[in-house]
Amino acid sequence: MVSTNPPVLPISTTATDTTNQPPIVTAVVESQPPVVRAFVNGVTETVCGGLSRSRPWSELLDRSAFTKPDSLSEAGTRFRKNSSYFRVNYVCIVALILGFSLLAHPFSLILLLCLAASWLFLYLFRPSDRPLILFGRSFSEYETLGGLILSTIAVIFFTSVGSVLISALMIGIATICVHGAFRAPDDLFLDEQDHAASGFLSFIGVPAIPSVAPSASSAASPV
């Protein structure tokens, strides 16, 4: 009897499924880093651009320029001029005081970092077309935003974070107020208009002081 080989049956594999899955997973994973990278690059460029417009610290701390104001109105005028001229330096001083205060209170720093990470990864960097899923439950955009707002209120007002932030801000504001009131601005504002229009965090700055050159020329012209 002649033996015949059994017919070869086609065997189906799931190779197509495995080959199609990695690109989908890769696309999902790689869709997040560019957003984070763009955010970090934007913040870095903003900070570096603002710091490049700061005034020399030797000019800020020039001891020969500190004099006692004659009146409260003069102190207010000095502060207004100095805050416009040293706006970037003042922001750096407040930021340094705030940073040292948080470093002195590690628990508050950890809570604040966790809160910031929650806002970044659960709301800002999360795709808007994908709902947030936690513990098997899907949360809508408004539910996520409401939860983050309530968490922020709870962390700031019911923990030590609020007191640390408020005390640091008060110390920083008091420091720049004292400096602005006692620093005589007679030698300042030589090129103020170039810097006031593009200052660091310009939304906290005061409007630029107009130049006195046009008024002086108009006063010198004959009637």
Swiss-Prot record:
Subunit (UniProt): Interacts with PRA1B1, PRA1B2, PRA1B3, PRA1B4, PRA1B6 and PRA1E.
GO process terms (BP): vesicle-mediated transport
Main location: membrane
Signal peptide extent: none
Recorded coiled-coil stretches: none
Species name: Arabidopsis thaliana
Protein known as: PRA1 family protein B5
Protein purpose: May be involved in both secretory and endocytic intracellular trafficking in the endosomal/prevacuolar compartments.
Membrane topology: Multi-pass membrane protein
Tissue distribution: Expressed in roots, lateral roots, lateral root caps, columella cells, leaves, and shoot apex.
Residue ranges crossing the lipid bilayer per the database entry: 83-103, 105-125, 146-166, 170-190, 196-216
Pfam families the UniProt entry points to: PRA1 (PF03208)
Similarity-based family: Belongs to the PRA1 family.
Alphabetic keyword roster: Endosome, Membrane, Transmembrane, Transmembrane helix, Transport
GO CC annotation: endoplasmic reticulum; endosome membrane
Disulphide bond pairs: none
Localization in the cell: Endosome membrane
Keyword Transmembrane helix listed: yes
